Amino acid sequence: MLIEDVDALKSWLAKLLEPICDADPSALANYVVALVKKDKPEKELKAFCADQLDVFLQKETSGFVDKLFESLYTKNYLPLLEPVKPEPKPLVQEKEEIKEEVFQEPAEEERDGRKKKYPSPQKTRSESSERRTREKKREDGKWRDYDRYYERNELYREKYDWRRGRSKSRSKSRGLSRSRSRSRGRSKDRDPNRNVEHRERSKFKSERNDLESSYVPVSAPPPNSSEQYSSGAQSIPSTVTVIAPAHHSENTTESWSNYYNNHSSSNSFGRNLPPKRRCRDYDERGFCVLGDLCQFDHGNDPLVVDEVALPSMIPFPPPPPGLPPPPPPGMLMPPMPGPGPGPGPGPGPGPGPGPGPGHSMRLPVPQGHGQPPPSVVLPIPRPPITQSSLINSRDQPGTSAVPNLASVGTRLPPPLPQNLLYTVSERQPMYSREHGAAASERLQLGTPPPLLAARLVPPRNLMGSSIGYHTSVSSPTPLVPDTYEPDGYNPEAPSITSSGRSQYRQFFSRTQTQRPNLIGLTSGDMDVNPRAANIVIQTEPPVPVSINSNITRVVLEPDSRKRAMSGLEGPLTKKPWLGKQGNNNQNKPGFLRKNQYTNTKLEVKKIPQELNNITKLNEHFSKFGTIVNIQVAFKGDPEAALIQYLTNEEARKAISSTEAVLNNRFIRVLWHRENNEQPTLQSSAQLLLQQQQTLSHLSQQHHHLPQHLHQQQVLVAQSAPSTVHGGIQKMMSKPQTSGAYVLNKVPVKHRLGHAGGNQSDASHLLNQSGGAGEDCQIFSTPGHPKMIYSSSNLKTPSKLCSGSKSHDVQEVLKKKQEAMKLQQDMRKKRQEVLEKQIECQKMLISKLEKNKNMKPEERANIMKTLKELGEKISQLKDELKTSSAVSTPSKVKTKTEAQKELLDTELDLHKRLSSGEDTTELRKKLSQLQVEAARLGILPVGRGKTMSSQGRGRGRGRGGRGRGSLNHMVVDHRPKALTVGGFIEEEKEDLLQHFSTANQGPKFKDRRLQISWHKPKVPSISTETEEEEVKEEETETSDLFLPDDDDEDEDEYESRSWRR
């Protein structure tokens, strides 16, 4: 709905709402005005307003809405205006327009006529008041001339209304009612400060005269020299626009703004103009395509749209056919004539064109209101801009010059530096602020500022010889300056400075603002996934890991050939294919190989100490991938931590994430650089013992976890003792892709143990078996105390630690840790309550013993309390026992059940693989069942791999690729179970708990058990079979070392004997 005077309606609503509403009347009035402005039919709008205002007004809603719409139709909310008498004034003006044949009266006739009409009441009238009267008369004459000229050229009228409208809206937006009161005071009575205001007014009007002189017809005589600035500035033609007069104060540009604010609200032409009507498009649609060119009112605080985004919002019509197409960005037009000697037309003081800056070639002005100006680039040579360069000639009435005059009060942009492109927008009303020193220097030199809305743009071609100033009428794409950035949004003057920051700031994409990628190449050429492991809490730096180029191996002591860590973190500065590719050069990647980044460790610094714990860090960093290791208080720093991921990609995601770590922007995440120092064997041994102690502690705390998790942890920890004996442990890793599934029996090396292991180490792996006898119990263990030091003992495949299972292990471990923590807290609280009750019980008993002469009533009360305490104490003890019993591991499945479940899972996996369905969950389940079956020893003989590795072999004898594989998986029949005697049947459960949690060996209830190796009746396998198994495993290992994902690249670039 159309509202004539929004402010009057708001004040009327505030008065009406004050007695009937508890809310702020002014805020609610604004809300009501916003509701009424909705573009809806009357009935819908009325119902909508009643619905929205019902919350505030309740019972008064319907009456208020009726009054509101009635007032909108009758307009009784408008203030009562005094009877306006200047009705016949337009008729008088029309008569004067008919009578007058010249555009401007001579100044002398005006003075004489004014003296006759208005005789001076005082003889001692000051000269300044006479000058003020003369200038006011001259303004009235100019207004009449302008009204007459309106019919000749409507375009000038639009521009003039645009400027008047802008000055009017700015004065309204600033709300300077003081200037209005001063202007009224000057017209009614004499102000003592009249002379000072008169000087400012005359200065401002003289500048307005020069500003408006470009719209005076050609036949109009130039103004007298008295109109020019009287401070010593030279007299210049009326067509020259002077922006910075010499008598202007040489400080900042605030004096312009203050002066303009104080005077723009008063009537510029000395007569009461009717208020402009509201713009219908702006009220109904929320925007007006004409913007500042619209002759209707847009309110006190109009919405200003940056014209950079305007073409994408409004489809403009194509440019007129008479105009040439816009040149490509950055192209320069030929030099334009300027002032200088020589025959020919030129706007300069010389009689002909010259190389100086000029505007003889004017920019075309768009004919339509909504059409943006065409993009034209004007080269202005390097000599500084003078006043004569801003001359607009009006030789041809059909064209007009670009308004190269910044309106008074605007903030000036910085001076033009050398070799920079300036693009100028014709309709851009937004200006940048100029620094005080540059502004004062400009005013001292007498040079005008750049043209309208100059935007700083770096040169497109820095290699060119000279790039001068360029003014463009199009709205350019904002680029980045090096030195200048204006203020941001100014709420006091949104139409001037609202888009100042957006013009100069470059917006980078997210990928550019992320941290630099510091991940690099290593000497390894194979795309084999790194070793997966469980989370291990460390208090010392981890043992460094290096990867060789030929065979994927985990070296648990520093390698002398290890490259600098910069290669692990950042890409090489040199292209990989530019280096020499010698056959014996193993430290360089192959030709056109993918960059292999292997650094998976991140250092986190400046962590608050209360947040530097495993739980908090795991919550944040587990979002980006599988965490292998978390180490708090890294290197003794309580505010540092070390995070190790499974792959380099996950570490890169974590370090390049823009999310604040633990909602703290001060926490820093860096790549971890390994020290070049090589730890001694002693430090390695200490680290190994510490890890074993940590795992032992964890196993005692989390003994209720599944046994295969416990087994994986110990196996990872026990893979390290080979460093003490100088051995290198080879870790085989075979990634399971979606197209192949592998069912392997656990090899011999998992059951043999290690040379460095002892009986106490092996006792960590005691697990239950399903078989039970009459008075004996069979336990299985993968460790053998009497073992032969062979090559197979040093090979430990990471099937149990592969990437597909480590994620599940981590999740299960995390959940179990949380549950365990809750249980421990509950148990701790119960224990505290139990201790307090026991103390209270002791205190009451001692009281009874001391006070033997106690009254029988008190004694009965104490006895009753003691009885209740005893019941509660026994109840708490039972609860503590049951909680500890619940934490014990549940009974494992029998061999038959486990084998049946394993077969069913394999069958489901085959069906899904044949149908092409997702097999991720089945693979996880199958891997867990494989671990359990290997622990129970129920994997059948000779099953081997159910499918080939990839089926893409090319007949090169590679580990059975594409031929069904040679892995026959021979079962080891050496004893791996214990026969335990010396206990009765009722003690079976306690014995199971004893062997699964405590590690007490043969001691049980003050008795010594008789333990010996269980010898089954099946004959043991021959030595030849053992040697054959070792060979088959080596064959499989050679196949596993080669990645399946990059077979074709290896086939292409691998050196072969028949190619040499």
UniProtKB/Swiss-Prot annotation:
This is RNA-binding protein 27. The keyword Coiled coil applies. The gene is RBM27. Residues 600-674 form the RRM domain. The modification Phosphoserine is found at S927, S1012, S1020. CDD domains: RRM_RBM27 (cd12517). PANTHER family: RNA RECOGNITION RRM/RNP DOMAIN, RNA-BINDING PROTEIN 27. Pfam families: PWI, RRM_1, zf-CCCH. Residues 91-143, 162-235, 319-412, 565-592, 940-968, 1006-1060 are annotated as: Disordered.
